[in-house]
C-alpha cells in the first residue's frame, strides 16, 4: 500500500508541481487547466486518462467547455501520496503539449 505523505513532505512535493494547491477541508490537491477550446480540453483528458489507467490511479475531474478541473487523492491511503504528485506532474506535462503551462 502507498503511504500518505506527511504535511512537510506534501508541502515540499507541491513545490514540484506549480499550479496545484491543497483542497480546503480534505486531503487532496487540485488544479484548473484552461485550454484553447473543448477539443483541446477533451484531448488532454483522453491522454491523461490513458496515463491514469496505466498507473491504476484515477482522478476526480470535471470538464466544462475548455476548462478541466482536477482533484487528486489516494482513497486507499486516506490522503495525498506520491501517486498523486506523480499523476499531477504527468498531467502538467500533457497540458504543456497543448501550450498550457
Swiss-Prot record:
From which domain of life does this come? Bacteria
Biological process terms from the Gene Ontology for this record are: tetrahydrobiopterin biosynthetic process
- InterPro entries with a match to the protein in the record: PCD_sf (IPR036428), Pterin_deHydtase (IPR001533)
Q: What is its EC number?
A: 4.2.1.96
Q: Which UniProt keywords apply?
A: Lyase
Reaction catalysed by this enzyme: (4aS,6R)-4a-hydroxy-L-erythro-5,6,7,8-tetrahydrobiopterin = (6R)-L-erythro-6,7-dihydrobiopterin + H2O
The Swiss-Prot or TrEMBL record annotates one GO molecular function as: 4-alpha-hydroxytetrahydrobiopterin dehydratase activity
PANTHER family for this protein: PTERIN-4-ALPHA-CARBINOLAMINE DEHYDRATASE (PTHR12599:SF0)
Q: Which family does it belong to?
A: Belongs to the pterin-4-alpha-carbinolamine dehydratase family.
HAMAP family xrefs: Pterin_4_alpha
- The protein's name in its UniProt record: Putative pterin-4-alpha-carbinolamine dehydratase
Which source organism? Answer: Rhodopseudomonas palustris (strain BisB5)
